[in-house]
Structure formats: structure tokens, C-alpha cells
Amino acid sequence: MTDHALLLVNLGSPASTQVADVRSYLNQFLMDPYVIDIPWPLRRLLVSLILIKRPEQSAHAYASIWWDEGSPLVVLSKRLQQAMKKEWSHGPVELAMRYGEPSIETVLTRLSEQGFKKVTLAPLYPQFADSTVTTVIEEAKRVVRAKSLKMQFSVLQPFYDQPEYVSALVESVRPHLEQPYDHLLLSFHGLPERHLHKRDPTGKHCLKDDCCMTAPAQVVATCYRAQCLQSAAAFAKRMGIPDGKWSVSFQSRLGRAKWIEPYTEARLDELAAQGVKKLLVMCPAFVADCIETLEEIGDRGAEQFKEAGGEELILVPCLNDDPNWAKELNRLCERAPLML
């Protein structure tokens, strides 16, 4: 049967590096209540203040990593889409972005018009967060309601500890670890701490001591930090990397609120001060290289590390469109449970 579509969903990107396009993208992204989780009037005020200077700054950053074909994240996601067409045997493989184009609404509407009633929704985020996974699911629900679409959805669950994901990481990163290096830093995207507190169903575990490695399953199921730490530990164990030669940090802090620590910026300085000369950095929260990996780590992070006394920071590419990753992702999608 070929009546079951697969919809891959990633974050998105501005349409171009023009300031106006970047402003439009940032406005859509930051006004999402799952991203900035404060009441609408305050969120509108805060985002309006951010949009005074941030679009020009971000446009410059995007321009520094933009490819001839377009946004690296979009280009790489399209390549993964093509690779998945060789693996998914049940119907078409489509790609949507949560922000920007092609939108979830555009793609779901087209699939409905083509007669598809079964869709596997695949948010391309290994670890759970409301600002990534939940917002994708809720947007799909909104579209179905608004358009009165007759569709059933299976939803790919966070796969932070799944053997397929860990194996794909291992095979992708292994060649880089075969070269001499002093330390491996696993830099995950950060989140405000309040996002974690809100999602602790017990109200007893979040950020208390090192609860992430001992919390019960019901807590871990919605704890981004716990899932990041467990992803890192599973990867290091599979690779046989000794304790002390790898560590975890969190990047991309926005605003003044307390975010998950340790911050990647601080960790880069600490590692250089500890005598680390050759540093490898991988970003396991991202399945495709993007501004947060290429510019924030590969450019600015590398410069910061050298200024702090290090000699070389090597950014390990994300999974991107690696054929082995496509095979493993297909296995994950095949067993996505029916949810919507």
C-alpha cells in the first residue's frame, strides 16, 4: 500500500538573508507561545523590543553561513527528504518547516487534496521540548481543525535514547574521533529552566542535585535536560570514550532568564584554561547543520576557543543526509504510534 505519507518537520529558516525576511521569520518564531511562554501582551512587547536590533544581527550571521542553494538547514533537510524516499515504502515523503516555508499547513493541505488520510508526523528533534516537539504537534492539530481535514496521524516520539539514533550518531562521528583530540564537547541547544520546571509532573525532581540520571520514567519523558544527558551518556558508552574526556554543555541562550547550565560559551573558556588544545564539538540536539552549529559553534565558538588559549575547535557535522541516518530514521518512523 502507498497511501500513508511521511511528513518530516524541522525548525525552519528565513527565506533569505535580507533583514526583512529575517525579521519576519524571527517574529513568527518568537511569537510562538511554546517558545516564549509568557502572556501574549508581554510576549508581543518583548518580541517587539527584540526585533529592533536582532534582525540585522541575525541577518549578518545567516549571510556568513548561507549556501548558494539557500539556507543550510533547508538544503540539508531536503536532501534528507530525498534519502528517505528510498527508505519509506508506504507513500510520499514530504518536508515542512515549523516556521517559514514550506509550512505545515501548506503541506498537510496538499496531502489532503491528494487524498492521503494517514500521515506519520516526524518532528526531527531527538529530545523532547515544548518549544520543538509540542509546537509541531499542536500546529498540525490546528491545521486539521481549521481546514476540517480528515486525517489520522502517527507521531514520531523523541528518540534520544533509541538504538537507531545512537547508532547513527556513532557511525557519523566515529571518523572524527579516530583522529587525535583532547576533549569532546557535546553542545545541546539550551532551554530556560522554567520550561523544565513546568514539565516535571511530580514537582520534586527538576534540577535538584543530579536528578536527571536518576529520575523516574514519568519525569524523564518530558525532561529535556535528562534526555540530553542520557543521549550523551549512551553515545559516550557506545564509543568507549572515558570519563573526563567528554562533557556536556548548552548553547544559544536568549535573554536574561536562567537557562540550563553549563553554558557552552563558559565551557569553551574553561576547557581552554584547563589546557585543552584540540577540541571536538558535536551538537546532538540538531539532526541538520544550521546557524546554531555552523555560525555559533563553527565560527564564533572556534574564535572564542582560540582567544581563550585553545589551538583548534573542530565542529563535527550533524547527521544531515547521511544514508545510514536515513535508514535508522525510517526504522524509527515505522513504529511511530497512532496519536491524533
From Swiss-Prot:
InterPro entries on file: Ferrochelatase, Ferrochelatase_C, Ferrochelatase_N
Keywords, in A-Z order: Cytoplasm, Heme biosynthesis, Iron, Lyase, Metal-binding, Porphyrin biosynthesis
Gene3D superfamilies, A to Z: 3.40.50.1400
Subcellular localization: Cytoplasm
Pathway where this protein functions: Porphyrin-containing compound metabolism; protoheme biosynthesis; protoheme from protoporphyrin-IX: step 1/1
First-listed, main subcellular location of the protein, grouped into a coarse class: cytoplasm
Name under which the protein is recorded: Ferrochelatase
UniProt lineage: Bacteria, Pseudomonadati, Pseudomonadota, Gammaproteobacteria, Pseudomonadales
